[in-house]
């Protein structure tokens, strides 16, 4: 039995008589809300337990990327989320004299994933859209103001105890997913430790709502690299702006959150008569990975599984990738009769992938603390003496799929079908078996509730994508990574890929 402290409410009663759900999600931040929306597409019976009574009304996370947007697309919420967001133009790293050290421009065109590569957003807007999606899901039950007091894995089922509306409740679930942040009760129930990757700094985060537009402040994020006091300026949607200021070890939170400390550091950019400070908080930026992401029927995702400095804007994005990976595997086990061992691949695929993002964010943070301009110039030198940074695009390590297939775990582009819809819309949470008609007609395809067949001959951008990849057919996962591929010299190979697919994903 795996326990966090168990109340008496968990004892002396028949487990079979308790309300049962297929999945219980603990925590309703963006990661948990996205997971609930995805699972609803598979008509899963989901209970979400969130301790807060309402959505936090002020900004926290401020960035997501095209991969996250593709997941939002898969749950039918991309239009609303995109309407409230702002396409991000990029980041400039400068020294204390504002000399450009490193440029990180973000493309202003739709990218290969079908969306702009980078967005700035207002988190209350995002959470409102995600919660709107949950409200429309008939199979998802949400309890706000619910404090989880106990989690116990009994082997064939998980017991969850919680307080809600003044009463103690106990339910059971096939699986419990902790998306409940750095102090996760689910991670505690797993008795799971942190692996510390060595970065810890205290920063003051200030969110300002301007009284009127200030185009002179610029649209680029500005990272000021200064050994004494690194700072960050972020252009957020509408009239929201963020400043982040590194703190010295001896500076106390009560002292640095005063107007006397803050406003002199925001001048000359803005003054008190040009906007109001909506939020001021001291954060500890850390770099940590949970040593295990699964223990029996308990799993963790998002900040419950990893913490990273914000310098890449990938913290929330990583949580979205977590649940996109995990959700379809839960569907495979609970709906498609896949072996429970498939869920082990959640940790093996996601943990080291996440490590890359954390380590890169740490390097950026170290660069911001550098006194030497040369240390920032780690990429190709441009004629003006500044370097240009490229975005991370990482495939999965140890991905499931046919043994020896180098494309298994590779992140795939999203072509537009000749019908006008994006490929992900046609997939609707399923796998896609993609290839020419002759190849598709030569095999027995999975049931339509598991996979959709996409003809390369009927859709020109699909055919072009396969050609660019040097393959003639593939199976694309619901999280848009490749399961397996077929090379031109092996036109009969799709049957082998499908055999492996049936072995690993459904029976």
Language model features with spans:
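Helical substrate-recognition/capping region of FAD-dependent monooxygenase/halogenase enzymes
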Residues: 2-22, 26, 41-42, 73, ...
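Core beta-strand elements of the Rossmann-like FAD/NAD(P) dinucleotide-binding domain
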Residues: 19-21, 166-175
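N-terminal Rossmann-fold NAD(P) dinucleotide-binding loop
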Residues: 32-33
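Glycine-rich FAD pyrophosphate-binding loop
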Residues: 40-60
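Active-site-adjacent segment of FAD-dependent monooxygenases/related oxidoreductases
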Residues: 60, 65-133
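Conserved FAD-binding catalytic core of PHBH/FMO-like flavoproteins
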Residues: 132, 150, 175, 179-285
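A conserved short coil-to-beta-strand element within the FAD-binding core of flavoproteins
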Residues: 144-158
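FAD/FMN-dependent oxidoreductases across multiple families
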Residues: 253-318, 353, 357-360, 489
């Amino acid at each position: 039995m795996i326990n966090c402290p168990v109340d008496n409410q968990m004892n002396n009663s028949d487990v079979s008589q308790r309300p049962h759900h297929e999945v219980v999600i603990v925590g309703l931040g963006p990661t948990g809300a996205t997971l609930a929306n995805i699972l609803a597409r598979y008509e899963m019976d989901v209970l979400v337990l969130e301790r807060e009574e309402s959505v936090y009304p002020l900004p926290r996370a401020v960035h997501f990327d095209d991969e996250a947007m593709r997941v939002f697309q898969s749950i039918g919420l991309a239009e609303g989320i995109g309407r409230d967001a702002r396409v991000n133009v990029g980041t400039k790293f400068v020294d204390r004299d504002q000399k450009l050290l490193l440029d990180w421009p973000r493309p202003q065109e739709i990218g290969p994933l079908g969306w702009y590569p980078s967005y700035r957003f207002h988190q209350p807007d995002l959470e409102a859209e995600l919660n709107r999606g949950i409200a429309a899901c008939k199979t998802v039950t949400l309890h706000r103001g619910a404090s989880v007091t106990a989690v116990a894995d009994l082997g064939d089922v998980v017991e969850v105890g919680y307080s809600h509306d003044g009463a103690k409740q106990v339910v059971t679930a096939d699986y419990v997913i902790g998306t409940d942040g750095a102090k996760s009760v689910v991670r505690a129930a797993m008795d799971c430790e942190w692996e510390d990757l060595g970065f810890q700094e205290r920063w003051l985060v200030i969110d300002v709502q301007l009284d009127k537009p200030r185009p002179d402040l610029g649209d680029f994020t500005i990272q000021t690299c200064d050994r004494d006091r690194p700072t960050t300026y972020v252009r957020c949607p509408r009239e929201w702006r963020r400043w982040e200021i590194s703190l010295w070890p001896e500076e106390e939170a009560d002292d640095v959150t005063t107007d006397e400390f803050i406003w002199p550091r925001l001048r000359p950019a803005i003054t008190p008569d040009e906007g109001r400070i909506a939020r001021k908080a001291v954060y500890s930026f850390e770099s940590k990975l949970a040593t295990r992401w699964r223990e029996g029927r308990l799993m963790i995702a998002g900040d419950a599984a990893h913490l990273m400095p914000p310098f890449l804007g990938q913290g929330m994005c990583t949580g979205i990738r977590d649940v996109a990976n995990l959700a379809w595997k839960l569907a495979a086990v609970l709906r498609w009769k896949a072996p429970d061992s498939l869920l082990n691949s959640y940790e093996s695929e996601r943990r080291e992938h996440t490590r890359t993002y954390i380590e890169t964010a740490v390097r950026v943070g170290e660069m911001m603390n550098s006194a030497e301009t040369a240390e920032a110039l780690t990429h190709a030198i441009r004629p003006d003496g500044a370097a240009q940074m490229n975005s991370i695009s990482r495939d999965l390590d140890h991905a499931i799929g046919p043994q020896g297939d180098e494309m298994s775990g590779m992140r795939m582009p999203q072509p537009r079908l000749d019908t006008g819809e994006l490929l992900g819309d046609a997939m609707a949470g399923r796998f896609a078996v993609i290839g020419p008609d002759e190849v598709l007609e030569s095999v027995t395809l999975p049931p339509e509730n598991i996979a959709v067949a996409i003809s390369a001959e009927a859709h020109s951008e699909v055919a072009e994508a396969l050609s660019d990849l040097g393959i003639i057919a593939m199976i694309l996962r619901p999280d848009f990574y490749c399961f397996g591929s077929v090379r031109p010299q092996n036109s009969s190979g799709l049957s082998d890929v499908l055999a492996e697919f049936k072995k690993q994903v459904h029976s």
